[in-house]
Amino acid sequence: MAGRSGDPDEELLRAVRIIKTLYQSNPYPSPAGTRQARKNRRRRWRARQRQIHSISERILSACLGRPAEPVPFQLPPLEGLSLDCSKDGGTSGTQQPQGTETGVGRPQVLVEPPVVLGSGTKE
């Protein structure tokens, strides 16, 4: 691993210099030429930028010894969640035991589903 030999700060600075050189090696395309030529140059430039971004992530993860992105936050299952739009702050449409409050950790469960559309027959 790159961060284990020598000074870790020096290795990180070296990785940052490499990444900076990569980005500087891909300047934005010139505005000359026809519309289609400019569009093609920008498309190829964006593809190179994506490649440089992925290479940079790999360099940093190798240098730091961990992924560059944080671990995603675990969310509760969506099946048990509902929106409580009551204005009075009550528990309209939910069943709760006496003395408990609904918060982020306790999803609200609807007792009966709301009617969104009618039966489809015109009266």
Swiss-Prot record:
Residues recorded with modification Phosphoserine: 5, 92
Record's compositionally biased regions (Basic residues): 36-50
Residue spans of biased composition, Low complexity class: 93-105
GO CC aspect terms: host cell cytoplasm; host cell nucleolus
Region (Disordered): 24-50, 79-123
InterPro entries, alphabetized: REV_protein
GO aspect biological process, one term: viral process
Record flagged with keyword Phosphoprotein: yes
Positions of the UniProt region annotated as Homomultimerization: 18-26
Subcellular location per the Swiss-Prot or TrEMBL entry: Host nucleus, Host nucleolus; Host cytoplasm
Post-translational modification: Asymmetrically arginine dimethylated at one site by host PRMT6. Methylation impairs the RNA-binding activity and export of viral RNA from the nucleus to the cytoplasm. Phosphorylated by protein kinase CK2. Presence of, and maybe binding to the N-terminus of the regulatory beta subunit of CK2 is necessary for CK2-mediated Rev's phosphorylation.
Function: Escorts unspliced or incompletely spliced viral pre-mRNAs (late transcripts) out of the nucleus of infected cells. These pre-mRNAs carry a recognition sequence called Rev responsive element (RRE) located in the env gene, that is not present in fully spliced viral mRNAs (early transcripts). This function is essential since most viral proteins are translated from unspliced or partially spliced pre-mRNAs which cannot exit the nucleus by the pathway used by fully processed cellular mRNAs. Rev itself is translated from a fully spliced mRNA that readily exits the nucleus.
Name of the protein in its database record: Protein Rev
Phylogenetic classification of the source organism: Viruses, Riboviria, Pararnavirae, Artverviricota, Revtraviricetes
Gene that produces this protein: rev
